[in-house]
């Protein structure tokens, strides 16, 4: 049997760590729901998927990093939704870490670029760009890793979209299409 490519899906926050909360919409819940859609699509396409949490539980950043680093996975995608002081802030951001290890930096940036392109193709959302970031889960992991911010809960128009499962499913489809595009090019 061919060994399946393994992918880590990391739903941000959880348990008593709510992330952003706007009205009845709680980031930790939306992160998990979107991550479940991503995991289901990946499994359907023949990948081995490991999630850092499958329920509404608290998992420390250190534990998330350890899960990823022990996993021997090909890559990790961390899923979050955004918040800003300004209600006008809108769009998707994808972060990678400028790793001193050149190959990991390049792989993570290539993954981020591929995912951004596919997500925009499907969702027609605004792009705030692929950026380098210093988040623990992308900095301290040893496999290529990105952190997706799937839109602003603090923006009314975007919140309206994020409330709809169909939008989260299309976001998930874009993330999966991007992962597959990245893996096909062999820039692992």
Predicted features along the sequence, with ranges:
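Active-site-proximal helix/loop segments of hydrolytic enzymes
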Residues: 25-188
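Short, surface-exposed beta-strand segments enriched in small/polar/acidic residues
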Residues: 7-21, 93
